Each structure stands twice: as C-alpha cells, then as structure tokens.
Amino acid sequence: MANLRKSHPLLKIANDALVDLPAPSNISVWWNFGSLLGLCLVTQIATGLFLAMHYTSDIATAFTSVAHICRDVNYGWLIRSIHANGASFFFICIYLHIGRGLYYGSYLYKETWTIGVVLLLLVMMTAFVGYVLPWGQMSFWGATVITNLLSAVPYVGGTLVQWIWGGFSVDNATLTRFFAFHFLFPFIIAAATVIHLLFLHETGSNNPTGLNSDSDKVPFHPYFTYKDLLGFAVLLTALASLALFSPNLLGDPDNFTPANPLVTPPHIKPEWYFLFAYAILRSIPNKLGGVLALLFSILVLMLVPFLHTSKQRSLMFRPVTQFLFWSLVADVMILTWIGGMPVEHPFVIIGQVASLIYFSLFLVLIPTAGLMENKILGWK
C-alpha cells in the first residue's frame, strides 16, 4: 500500500509542497524569507485574533480598550507588543524577500512575481488600516492625510473620500470599517499566498546562479525544513527580544495621546516601513503627481520582468548591475530617512533627488547596464 502522505488527497498536496518538493541544492539563506513571511502571517493572525476579542471599534472606547488590553487582560501587553512589532518584522522580511527576487532574477517567474506585488499591496493596506485602530493622534491624522490623497482623483475624488470616510471627516464610521477591513485582509493575504506558492511550484525555485538546476535537486524535507526552522528560531528570538525589551522603539510617541481632531501633531508621518514611499509622495509639489508617484513607487515592481535586458538571470556574475542594485538599496534607505524628516531645506531637495534616482535605476539605469554587459561579453 502506498504511503498515506502520498495517496491521501489532502496530505498529497501538503506532501508535494513541503516534503517531496524538489528544491535546488544551492539555495542560500536568502531563500528562507518566504517561509519566514508565512510565520509572520500566522503570528499576526493569531495575536490579532486575541486582540480583536478585547478591542472595541468605537471612537469613544477604542483608545481605552487598547489600554485595557495592556493593563487588565492576561498577557495582553505581550500580545499587543508582538502584534505591533510583528508588523515591523513582516515588512523587514518582505523587503528582504523582494530584494532577493530583484538580485537573483526571480522576477522572471512572471506570475509568481505579479501575485507577490499584489501581496505586498495587500499587506501595506492591512498595515495602514491596522495603524488607525488604537485611535491615537498619529492613527487619526495618518488616516486623515492618507485617505485625503484620494481627493486628488479627477472628478470623483471628493465623493470617493467621503465614501471611504462614511461621512464628512474621519469619524466613527471610518474606524468601524477599518477594523472590518483589518480583520478581513489577512485571510485574503493567506489565500493569495497559496496562489503565490501554486505558481512558484509550477516552475520550481530559482537559485543564486540563475541557471537551470533540474540536474541537481534535493527533497525539501529534511534539508530545507530544518534550514527554515533555524530561520524561525532567529526571527522569533529577535521578535521576542524587541517586544519584551523595547516594545515602543519603532512606534510614535504621538500615538500615546488619544485622537483629537482639533490638535494637529507637528510632524505627521507613517510607520518606518512606509517612510520611503511617503518621501516619494512628498517630493512632488503637486497633489495628483505625488499620489501617482506614490502608487508607481510600488507598481514599478510590476514592470521589472519586462525591463530585464540581460542574457543572464542573476546578478551573481554582473558586477556593474550589482553596483546599481546596492545603489538602489542605499537610495531606499535615504528615502526612509527623508520620509521621517520635516519638510524643510535640505531634506526637500535630498528627497527629490533620491526619488528621481529611485525611478531612474528601475526604468533606465539597470536595463541599460544589462544591455551594456551583454555587449561587453559579446552576446548578441
């Protein structure tokens, strides 16, 4: 009789994805981040579920309900700390995962890459609506500023904003629907993740060389299950350390003040993981232009597979493009720094230059470098 994991209709799916999956023998630690993102998602759904049991999505009680969770609920402080800092780790893993994909040419699996960008947008939307829920000053004003961007849409902008607000300002209706969205989206993300994996397993994983690895595959279990477990241990240790020793390190002090529509905080800024996009938004003095730049700063990833000009897949053997890739990493870090700075000289011009370099690298410099490397190597 055949092994149950190979014959049972449900176990067979899990077996083909996690046990007998043929994986390249040379994939490095950069391939760990997919499973780490899965771990982050499970952690966020689990902690979020327990928070939702005690949270109330009403402007009169939202802030105090979060305080109640931290003070009166058994280990509520820990659950909230893990959930809030888990979001930061989620984005660290996402950005490293995307960076890996860009460096090693994994984006040439177009379907997997496209659904990955959709996943990024979903996670960003989830994090945004989640940040509004504690109903602190930065929650309220962040929601006001970001939802107001939709008013830049020609003709229907104003109506669209009021439709999302559920009134004429960010109010109770807004908070209630944001809570509903924040509860729903993680399950949509989980479903999209399954599709992401489905497309990945159609082609198999890429590897650091970017070459075909069909001749040298190893089973996923035990080799990569144990390798992933090491990653899990590192991530959970880091998350627990941050949540226990310095839970408010990445938060904004303004969010310890209950939301007040009559008092605007001196500097409205999002969480650190959105600062690069926020800097790009602010670098354009026109409202509609800024909104389009903000959207395109993420959607430019969709174009990457179509702008691949090199005959080689990975950057492993392409020093010129490697330099441009690390320039992009440095540029995103500069944008992140600028996004948290006030709108004044010299930060404005630095942000504008960094935004220009960001788009130039994706759309012009990296594709041109690919063509140049082909020519140097004499590849037609």
From Swiss-Prot:
Cofactor mode of binding and number, as noted: Binds 2 heme b groups non-covalently.
Which cofactors are named for this entry? heme b
- What InterPro entries is this protein classified in? Cyt_b/b6_C, Cyt_b/b6_C_sf, Cyt_b/b6_N, Cytb/b6-like_sf, Cytochrome_b, Cytochrome_b_C_euk/bac, Cytochrome_b_N_euk/bac, Di-haem_cyt_TM
According to the record, the segments passing through the membrane are: 33-53, 77-98, 113-133, 178-198, 226-246, 288-308, 320-340, 347-367
Classification via Gene3D superfamilies: Cytochrome Bc1 Complex, Chain C
User: Any idea which positions bind a ubiquinone?
Assistant: 201
GO annotation terms (biological process):
mitochondrial electron transport, ubiquinol to cytochrome c
Gene Ontology CC entries for this record: mitochondrial inner membrane; respiratory chain complex III
Name the principal localization, coarsely classed.
mitochondrion
What would be an example GO MF term here?
A: metal ion binding
The topology of this chain with respect to the membrane is: Multi-pass membrane protein
Q: How does it assemble?
A: The cytochrome bc1 complex contains 3 respiratory subunits (MT-CYB, CYC1 and UQCRFS1), 2 core proteins (UQCRC1 and UQCRC2) and probably 6 low-molecular weight proteins.
Q: What does this protein do?
A: Component of the ubiquinol-cytochrome c reductase complex (complex III or cytochrome b-c1 complex) that is part of the mitochondrial respiratory chain. The b-c1 complex mediates electron transfer from ubiquinol to cytochrome c. Contributes to the generation of a proton gradient across the mitochondrial membrane that is then used for ATP synthesis.
PANTHER family for this protein: CYTOCHROME B
Please state which protein family the record places this protein in. Belongs to the cytochrome b family.
Miscellaneous note, as given in the UniProt record, is:
Heme 1 (or BL or b562) is low-potential and absorbs at about 562 nm, and heme 2 (or BH or b566) is high-potential and absorbs at about 566 nm.
> Can you say what this protein is called?
Cytochrome b
Q: Which organism is it from?
A: Kareius bicoloratus (Stone flounder)
Read off the lineage from the record.
Answer: Eukaryota, Metazoa, Chordata, Craniata, Vertebrata
